[in-house]
Design a protein with these regions (language model features):
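Active-site groove signature of glycoside hydrolases
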Residues: 146, 175-213, 276
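Surface-exposed amphipathic alpha-helices with a cationic face
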Residues: 36-37, 126-142, 146, 219-237, ...
């Protein structure tokens, strides 16, 4: 990138930061009008477990101003049983019905300030999402199935025509029709569609996942069955129910598990992994979410946003159906001894962090700048990192996020997705940056 472009980007980022900092939380109607004028998808993952240690109830999406700047919320996650059905609670580590729809939410955590009443049919996150949608009528909520920990039995669900039909029917019954255990119909209207987060068809994910060579073809067939049954349900509700999927950044994973062009026949759009390229599992520090492969990268080939997006386009994906994933967290290393700016240097392991070693929220990382850590940038590669001489964090700050929104627009992509909304600060600074970058100006 030529120097004048660096200066221009810096000026734009400075202006954006001023606008974001100065802007008060927008009224729901104004935010909704603006987000839909732009035409880009803005997808945010809300984590089921965020209400606990992270103290992130659904209400914060409203009070921070995030909800008025999103088009979709993906609720993470719904589980898949060994016999290939959607279910909400199979025991410890297999679901959390309490968080989903049983926990009575007190008034101070409620979107509308009203506590859940004893004996009401729907409580918990699901009821709060329904209240959030009432305040933001254009906002859609999708149930995201699977994720890293709950993709174990996707292969079973997708294996045969009969298993696919039964699986899809169970998911629509549970989430779209809202037939929750013990409360038939109580959850109707909370979810508008389905997001498939199978990690990964015919490729290693979490240890213990069932993997079969035929997963690749079966994933396409599963999408077709979801589209068929969602459309049938939509004819009754007189509504289009969206179907989306989370797709990998690794070209080898793309080839092993996905039939490129075919899958987009059934998808409204797909979110593309734009992060976790590197982390504390690597012996050397690196970038976790760079726009382009940095000069001097020790890995060849290496991963980047551009590598991921170009990989899907080369395999037949329509540009407008690709939604770029942006992380609201960073990856970190400690015990770095190579000096310099810390990048591409040996480390002893993952950096200490609040919830998981080597993984820290943006809202925490932003406080490190000026407190012993120096912010470093590679504008050509589109990434930033913090370094204090021994510990390094690679992360996306507002400057990097804004650069990625400009890339989304220039590349003709369909929008941005974020993992996950609880990583942002109380002002929804990163979500506001996406909003600014994807709004015509």
């Amino acid at each position: 990138m030529r120097p004048f472009r660096h200066r221009r980007l810096t000026a734009v980022v400075t202006l954006a930061a001023l606008l974001i900092t100065a802007a008060p939380p927008a009224a729901a109607s104004a935010g909704d009008d603006k987000q839909h004028r732009s035409g880009y998808h803005r997808v945010g993952y809300f984590t089921q477990w965020g209400i606990y240690g992270r103290a992130f109830p659904v209400k914060k999406l409203d009070t921070s101003g995030a909800a008025s700047r999103l088009t979709h919320i993906n609720y993470a996650f719904g589980n898949v049983s060994e016999d290939g059905r959607c279910y909400v609670d199979g025991g410890p580590g297999e679901g959390d019905a309490w968080a989903d729809y049983q926990r009575p939410v007190p008034a101070e955590e409620s979107v509308d300030g009203v506590a859940d009443a004893p004996g009401q049919a729907l409580n918990g996150n699901f009821n709060q999402l329904a209240k959030l949608k009432a305040k933001h009528p254009k906002l859609q909520v999708l149930i995201s199935l699977g994720g890293w920990s709950w993709s174990t039995y996707f292969s079973n669900a997708a294996r045969t025509d009969a298993s696919r039909k039964a699986f899809v029917a169970s998911c629509i019954d549970l989430y779209l029709k809202g037939n929750l255990p013990g409360s038939p119909g109580a959850g109707a209207g909370v979810f508008d569609g389905i997001d498939l987060d199978w990690e990964w068809p015919n490729w290693d994910g979490e240890p213990g996942n069932v993997i079969r060579p035929e997963d690749r073809e079966n994933f396409t067939k599963l999408l077709a069955e979801f589209r068929r049954q969602l459309d049938a349900h939509g004819r009754k509700t007189r509504t289009h129910h969206p179907l989306t999927a989370f797709l990998p950044a690794n070209p080898a994973t793309m080839d092993a598990g996905y039939e490129g062009r075919k899958i987009f026949t059934y998808l409204d759009f797909a979110t593309v992994q734009g992060y976790d390229f590197h982390g504390g599992w690597d012996a050397k520090t690196n970038q976790q979410s760079a726009l382009r492969v940095p000069t001097g990268s020790p890995d060849n080939p290496d991963f980047s946003v551009e590598v991921a997006v170009d990989g899907w386009i080369a395999r037949g994906a329509p540009r407008g159906k690709l939604v770029l994933g942006i992380p609201y967290y960073g990856r970190g290393w400690t015990g770095i001894t190579g000096g310099g700016n810390g990048l591409f240097q040996p480390a002893t392991g993952p950096a200490p962090a609040t919830f998981e070693a080597g993984n820290e929220d943006y809202k925490k990382l932003k406080t490190l700048a000026g407190n012993g850590f120096t912010v470093h940038r590679d504008l050509r590669a589109g990434h930033a990192w913090l370094f204090d001489g021994t510990t390094l964090w690679t992360y996306d700050d507002p400057a990097v996020v804004l650069q990625k929104t400009l890339y989304i627009r220039r590349a003709g992509l369909g929008g941005a997705m974020v993992w996950s909304l609880d990583g942002d600060d109380d002002n929804a600074t990163l979500t506001r940056t996406i909003d600014l970058g994807l709004t015509t100006w």
